[in-house]
Amino acid sequence: MINGPQVSFITICYNGFKDTCELIESLQNKIHSVSYEIIVVDNASREDEAVKIQALYPSVTTIHSDENKGFSGGNNLGMKAARGQYLFLINNDTYIESDGIAYLIERLESHPEIGAASPKIRFA
């Protein structure tokens, strides 16, 4: 029995407030097939973007880092806070076009030899 969301979407924000808001909105508008949480790690932006994001999106978990820990370090902070069964690391300048998450989960669950899955990514 899962006591948390199926998926934790984790993204890093470093002076990318607009991009991060667009990502959050695309997740909220497109992902309906699974339960999920969104975690935004503010990687020491000039302005405290975690506070602004939390005010606009109260359901989003925000983490403020006093120092820029880079991509790996920022994601590690997000993963420590994650409650999901699956972790989905996603760049904040990504836009979700469709809900294919359930397909990825189905593949992972039906093939235990698979350790990771990723959707097709197109560059704009």
Listing of model-derived features with the role each one plays in the protein:
Residues 87:
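Short aromatic/hydrophobic "clamp" motif used to bind/position activated sugar donors
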Residues 6-8, 37:
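Cell-envelope/extracellular polymer assembly enzymes that use nucleotide-activated donors
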Residues 26, 42-51, 67:
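A conserved acidic beta->alpha catalytic loop
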Residues 35-44, 63-65:
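Short beta-strand/loop segment that forms part of the nucleotide-sugar
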Residues 25-35:
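Short, acidic, metal-binding catalytic loop of nucleotide-sugar glycosyltransferases
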Residues 64-82, 103:
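Glycine-rich, basic loop-to-helix element that forms the pyrophosphate-binding segment
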Residues 91-95:
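The conserved acidic donor/metal-binding loop of glycosyltransferases
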Residues 98-124:
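Conserved donor NDP-sugar-binding/catalytic core segment of glycosyltransferases
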